[in-house]
């Protein structure tokens, strides 16, 4: 009986320690839409948080043809990649703080995918380099909430202009392109997601939706 009580107390202490070490909510973005689903126009604000900046990457981010750009859609309000003709990435940047994504820092987001598409995490470090993470969410049966920690990821360097992965050959000409050394997540400038496959257009076929997007990590002042 005493052993059971001690085991329960130890378990409770460990649980309390985990919660005590959990980082705070750094930001939560649920997007806003004016009217029906449409291509995001240059300079259009689709953010609900005034302290965030949205960065769009890849040729489809600035395409002159609205039917080749990234869209804002609903319901729920989400970023939709179906009309993109190239790989695409979007990130969020806090105007006042970097974010420390070490330890138990995590993302919690609501996503959906079609075809072979998947949502991957993207970070821009304080040194200006971009990386895309191994984690992917590709649920096709509806919008699904999921979460993951940054510290558990393997990363590949990301050519942000084209939104394609880059790397060097490893031992025995291994072409996986994973970073061989851990990346420094203690001061991250931007956090977002990538769809590494062009969209298929209207209707089911190939795209991702990213709705509610939460990042948990410790703020680090920019100045």
Language model regions located:
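Intrinsically disordered, low-complexity segments enriched in glycine/proline and serine/threonine
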Residues: 6-7, 32
């Amino acid at each position: 009986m005493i052993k059971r009580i001690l085991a329960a107390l130890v378990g409770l202490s460990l649980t309390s320690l985990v919660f005590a070490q959990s980082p705070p909510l750094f930001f939560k973005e649920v997007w806003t839409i004016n009217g029906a689903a449409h291509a995001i126009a240059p300079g259009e604000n689709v953010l609900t948080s005034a302290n965030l900046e949205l960065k769009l990457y890849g040729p489809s981010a600035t395409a002159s043809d609205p039917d080749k750009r990234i869209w804002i859609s609903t319901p729920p309000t989400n970023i939709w990649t179906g009309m993109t003709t190239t790989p695409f990435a979007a990130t969020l940047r806090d105007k006042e703080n970097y974010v420390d994504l070490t330890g138990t820092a995590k993302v919690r987001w609501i996503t959906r995918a079609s075809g072979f598409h998947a949502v991957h995490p993207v970070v821009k470090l304080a040194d200006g380099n971009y990386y895309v993470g191994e984690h992917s969410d590709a649920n096709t049966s509806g919008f699904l909430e999921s979460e993951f920690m940054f510290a558990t990821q393997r990363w590949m360097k990301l050519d942000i202009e084209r939104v394609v992965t880059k790397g060097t050959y490893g031992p025995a000409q291994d072409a996986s392109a994973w970073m061989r050394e851990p990346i420094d997540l203690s001061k991250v400038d931007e956090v977002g997601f990538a769809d590494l496959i062009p969209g298929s257009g209207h209707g089911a076929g190939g795209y991702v939706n990213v709705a509610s997007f939460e990042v948990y990590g410790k703020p680090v002042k920019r100045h």
